[in-house]
Amino acid sequence: RLVGSEMCIRDSLWLDLKGPILADTVYIGGTLVAKDVTISLPAVTPVTADFKAMGTYTAPILGQIEAMEASITKIGIDLGLRNMIKLESKTIEIRWAQDVKQADGSTKTEGCKAFLRCVSKGIPGLSVDPGNTSENEATFAVSRYQLYVGGAEYWLIDQLNTILRVGGVDYAKDIRSLL
């Protein structure tokens, strides 16, 4: 039986095991536009620069981010697809539930949300094949990306307002203070 600091050490070695995504929904302007779809959220990749240091040292520049892109693959040609494709700036809210296995062996369902400010990158080519469903991928140029897991903000990246906040630390704060 572990007690005191031994127990704290053991408990600190456990991470909740994040399981499968159970379901997802997509909203634009508070209106449901898609359900149980495949979503690719943006990668956030800092621009890099080369420095001379015993040759070349390549490091990220935390004030510059490569273009962010997201995609949603939706079944069917419907009003939800039309609303996603409108060629105007929009905020897309994505909600999903995931299974989590906890240290005591119990399972809980955890809610996650992502908010994207984006514009459609175009109208996708539609697949129309008798006897098969129409699967269509909408892609978006993203300027703002915010992620919440279990009610806690994980990150907020806002290229237009120079915000790069990860885990509560704003890495662009010093840049904004000088501008």
Predicted feature descriptions by range:
Residues 31-38, 106-118, 156-159:
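Short amphipathic beta-strand/extended segments with alternating polar/hydrophobic composition
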Residues 1-9:
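Short, small-residue-biased leader/transition segments that mark boundaries at the very start
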Residues 72-78, 96-102, 116-122, 142-147:
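Beta-strand elements of well-folded, non-transmembrane domains
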Residues 10-79, 117-128, 169-178:
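Solvent-exposed edge beta-strands and adjacent loop segments
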Residues 69, 111-115, 137:
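Well-ordered beta-strand positions in beta-sheet-rich domains
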Residues 119-179:
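Mixed-charge, glycine-accented linear interaction segment located at domain edges/termini
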Residues 84-114:
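Short, acidic/charged, Gly/Pro-enriched secondary-structure junctions
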Residues 62-66, 86-90, 132-134:
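Solvent-exposed loop and beta-edge segments used for protein-protein assembly and interaction
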